[in-house]
Amino acid sequence: QMPWHTVDPFLFCVHHLDDYPKGTANMTPVGSLQGRNIGSDFSNKDGWSMYHGRTVPGFPRHPHRGFETITIARQGIIDHSDSMGATARFGSGDVQWMTAGKGVVHSEMFPLRHQEKKNPTELFQIWLNLPREDKFVEPYFTMFWRDSISVVEVLDEQDRLSTVQVVAGQFDGRSAPAPPPNCSPRFLPTASISSIKIIHGEFF
């Protein structure tokens, strides 16, 4: 789950995979939080972390400026709210794109909605640098809901299927949803972001 190596304009990329337990009526984890560094728990104890959350896992209000965040939800639920007044509850297959620009405060929490079963949560988050002239553009928030995102199916030589969800740019002639108005112009013409599902042993 540690950040991956990136190159400009990508500032940061991290993969979160947490096998959260059943939730309570307040969407907090069932059981004790003893042994965790509450407020900064990245322990992966029992297969999951609280991160900066104190009752509900996740990342309470914190600031960003001068770059963009792209959050790709693979499994579970994410609750977003920010200083622009935007809120969203999104999950499996949805993508959130936020341009921090001149500054925004937001939170990303992982509510444990299911009381009768576990609440596994998986997501990728990418930070995308803005060029100097766009560092202080107006903040912007948008959602790419799962049904609006192109998915390309790819078969290998043994007819095993991979799927490519096109989040930004293009893949195999299919385009991603329209990006925010002030996204990095250095990024989109030359690169793409895709979420790819590959079966174990498959070639892509």
What spans do the regions from the language model cover?
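Jelly-roll (double-stranded beta-helix
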Residues: Q1-F204
